[in-house]
């Protein structure tokens, strides 16, 4: 089966003549197939150079004709220009073209007009898409390989928006980021707009968290829309990263920046569930205070357990307070905290990988709550900018209890701060102030 590709400048009369000859061959020969590529005149030179370079060809004029050994996309064998194609058609098929010059010029004009119209329609189509733009930093992290497919889950974002993914990373190579982009395209998801890879190797010290997120904040301030929403997740300095973004994007509402505590909250629920011999999903309303990746405090004052096999049983929906079901106070004060601090590291040491699945699940839980209608009774923990709630110093990004209503979060005011909790909150605040001062010192020294 003969498979040919015909490419040329859209306004080239010889491309028009070759196109007509190819149509005649395809119409009369059952095994002859042609694929046409009309290229805008302004783009032709660059397109031709790139095509020839990638295939090892030498050709300098329009049109360009080659034969593919398998279906379009396979290895190509250069045939040449118009004269070569005409000679090939005469020699192999006994068919030639007798198109006159004035008709060639007329068809060339029509080709150019058609190409311009198609380009205008494509521009209009892209403008009318209005995709939801999602930027992912550290896109080469294993978490992203798990996260990206789930971003297209129905119900995660209100409506079914077209998603435009922007993948950024400074720790790997441009080739690795390009490979991730190719894998994303291979998902073949209709709601995926063309993903973009944004590789940046300008930073000399990629491990400098302060420098890194100081710059990210400036980029958000300069380029992002004012209703942008930013979720910070990770294993180190999460509160500080979120704080730096807020400081360097002053025109963006600080409520649009949050640090993810959910993974830590779920890990606490897992330890409690194992202690009570229930499923993790049977534990709810666990509150995490403080520094998400540092000194934090697990508050169980509102925590509930469902389907607990104890002396008191009830129907579906019946719950009991976790604090009343756990009688081992020594375990809560010692082993519980120790297990929680080691949990993520234990998993990573066994798999030699980051905790990608649980991190992905936590990110999706917050995205779903933040972008949809959630029950105002459900308690989440979230790192947000303090305005002095619960006596926490204003200006610190601090994990505290929140609830989501109509796509917005609000701090829960119905939480009691005991004397013991106050001591823990003060200790967390002191550590966060130290991290903030450290970041400020780093930025000052590098200025």
From Swiss-Prot:
Coiled coil: none
GO terms of molecular function: L-malate dehydrogenase (NAD+) activity
SUPFAM superfamilies named in the record: LDH C-terminal domain-like, NAD(P)-binding Rossmann-fold domains
Pfam families found in the cross-reference section: Ldh_1_C
Domain of life: Eukaryota
UniProt keywords, alphabetically: NAD, Oxidoreductase, Tricarboxylic acid cycle
InterPro entries the record matches: Lactate/malate_DH_C, Lactate_DH/Glyco_Ohase_4_C, Malate_DH_type2, NAD(P)-bd_dom_sf
Class in the EC hierarchy, top level: oxidoreductase
EC number in record: 1.1.1.-
GO biological process: malate metabolic process; NADH metabolic process; oxaloacetate metabolic process; tricarboxylic acid cycle
Family recorded in the similarity comment: Belongs to the LDH/MDH superfamily. MDH type 2 family.
Protein name: Putative malate dehydrogenase 1B
Natural source organism: Danio rerio
């Amino acid at each position: 089966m003969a498979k040919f590709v015909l490419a040329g400048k859209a306004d080239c009369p010889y491309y028009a003549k070759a196109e007509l000859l190819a149509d005649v061959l395809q119409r009369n020969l059952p095994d002859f197939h042609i694929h046409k590529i009309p290229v805008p005149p302004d783009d032709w030179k660059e397109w031709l150079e790139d095509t020839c370079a990638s295939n090892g060809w030498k050709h300098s004029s329009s049109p360009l004709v080659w034969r593919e050994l398998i279906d379009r996309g396979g290895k190509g064998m250069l045939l040449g220009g118009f004269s070569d194609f005409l000679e090939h058609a005469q020699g192999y098929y006994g068919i030639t073209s007798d198109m006159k010059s004035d008709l060639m010029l007329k068809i060339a004009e029509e080709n150019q007009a058609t190409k311009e119209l198609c380009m205008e329609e494509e521009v209009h189509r892209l403008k009318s898409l209005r995709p939801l733009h999602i930027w992912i930093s550290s896109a080469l992290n294993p978490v992203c390989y798990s996260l990206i497919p789930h971003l297209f889950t129905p119900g995660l974002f209100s409506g079914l928006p077209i998603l435009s993914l922007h993948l950024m990373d400074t720790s790997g190579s441009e080739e690795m980021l390009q490979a991730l982009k190719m894998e994303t395209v291979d998902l073949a998801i209709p709601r995926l707009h063309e993903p973009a890879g944004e590789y940046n190797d300008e930073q000399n010290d990629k491990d400098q968290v302060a420098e890194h997120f100081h710059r990210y904040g400036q980029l958000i301030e300069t380029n992002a829309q004012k209703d942008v929403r930013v979720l910070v997740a990770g294993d180190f300095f999460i509160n500080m990263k979120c704080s730096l973004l807020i400081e360097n994007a002053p025109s963006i509402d600080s409520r649009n920046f949050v640090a993810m505590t959910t993974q830590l909250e779920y890990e606490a629920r897992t330890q409690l569930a194992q202690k009570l011999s229930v499923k993790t999903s049977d534990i709810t309303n666990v509150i995490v205070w403080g520094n998400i990746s540092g000194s934090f405090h697990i508050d169980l004052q509102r925590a509930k357990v469902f389907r607990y096999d104890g002396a008191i049983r009830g129907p579906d929906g019946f719950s009991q307070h976790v604090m009343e079901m756990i009688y081992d106070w020594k375990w809560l004060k010692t082993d519980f905290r120790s297990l929680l601090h080691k949990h993520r590291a234990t998993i990573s040491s066994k798999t030699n990988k980051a905790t990608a699945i649980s991190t992905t699940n936590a990110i999706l839980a917050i995205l779903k709550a933040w972008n949809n209608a959630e029950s105002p009774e459900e308690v989440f923990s979230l790192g947000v900018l303090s305005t002095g709630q619960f006596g926490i110093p204003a200006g610190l990004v601090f994990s505290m209890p929140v609830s989501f209503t109509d796509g917005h979060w609000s701090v829960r005011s119905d939480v009691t701060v005991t004397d013991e909790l106050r001591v823990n909150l003060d200790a967390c605040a002191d550590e966060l102030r130290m991290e903030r001062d450290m970041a400020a010192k780093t930025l000052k020294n590098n200025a």
